């Protein structure tokens, strides 16, 4: 793992499964490539490339990137053995996770204390945020590491290139590309809670075609979603993905990518007559499709690279309660997003590059909530479009100082025009010290669900944010020790939150049209977040250590009873430490400690989510060039804890597995 501005991690511990080029990471490796405007292109998928692609939607030397970025390569992902992307990303600095139950439960990742729906999630260059989700964010429960070759976590407001919704940051996942004419891999693992995971892939490369196909299946018996429940709530997912790049000429190519998943998760609800959280037989079925088609054209001897693309996401969700009279369906929704875009990258001089583009995003949603009293309600439907223009210029003012400046103009069908800016800089002091700083803005309009669903509020205002960060990184000796510190600040206006209605409330907003409802969405006039991120990485011979600490203080600064209170589910203190020993035989063993401090589950700060510390152990051994065996024990001490009030979490689990490549 590489945390630029935060740290440079120890060398990777194991061989990644699905790429014949995925070897132990070399911290001195450098890859020379021509800038490309594709954040999911071949350089992004290269597990050895020490280049950052998310910050500029094209490759950059990390020493010239002003933003805070953590990079997980294919080798990092394989070494950490996590099946769920959320479990992997939440161990990086500045990221907090909450989950409603075990695997499959609604999962939220918050970057630097921002709300989960203020994070832009991207797979192979396509934004996967769901327009039918309450906040328009992405439920990370259904995102598995699977065929992912690289993850970049970009912290702080990233409006210029990724849209105003990126108030907290961007999580960009890139699936693998082959290195040889034909290659493939298999993985199988099994563990406690009746958990199994199978996946496989084949891929190839020729002069004119690069292709890859993969499939996976994950299933677990899980734990009870209700913390006091007796029956377990399981989860399963089947997934297929593919990508192909056809080189028509040396300057013209076509990219096609797609990922499809089918998910089912059991959950608990609030059954009659008490309507209190309890064991139920409810479950959800979710189908997700992400598709991309792009045409790439290089002009001016490769100095001008153009990309014309269409991205499509579709999410269909159905919730069932077999005990409900008349109809078992309790929720039915569809979210769809179409995105047309042009992006260009012009090498003005060898030291300066401009990235620019235009986008049209069309989001639609349909949602209904049948019940025994209204088994066939009319579905709420809405659609909205956003037109955007953006430009960013980055380059070197000297051998030691690099800067980037960008602007974005969004035109929202409902909330009008908004201009957002961003600036960042990186300054090298000698060979061992690097200073970085950035400023960015965000603008997020209320979602279709927040406006038009049964809990909607047409009086909502758009969220707006300004964010800053300043950091220093220092390397000792030949890089055996790297330490870093970063401070950040963010002010947000009109943050949108869900407000519950008291039982029997007569307030008009709780009884629209004379019909009572459980709650509604409303603005919190002003919130703020500030914090410090510290990292250290040590590599001495066979021993390596990776550590990070995050202090994140959030505050409601609006008038009212909650003024001065912390925002919900934002731990103020978090720390992670991983210590690894590698033997000459190839055997490696890691002890991983995670600490999450106390937080509050609600805006009133009346319920405390207690702090917890978890110990995980993992090991791997390459039997030969083809096979690797591995195993892990998570939550070794079987500690009980909560990340959301009254929701269960996994106790001790054990897993063994095998990887093969050919």
Where in this protein do the model-derived segments appear?
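Gram-negative outer-membrane beta-barrel transporters
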Residues: 396-403, 483, 489-491, 516-603, ...
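Conserved C-terminal beta-signal and adjacent last beta-strands/turns
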Residues: 8, 201-203, 214, 247, ...
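N-terminal Sec signal peptide and the immediately downstream disordered periplasmic leader
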Residues: 1-92, 203, 246, 250, ...
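Transmembrane beta-barrel wall of Gram-negative outer-membrane proteins
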Residues: 192-219, 229-265, 283-305, 348, ...
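Extracytoplasmic beta-strand/coil segments of soluble accessory domains associated
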Residues: 54, 86, 90-127, 149
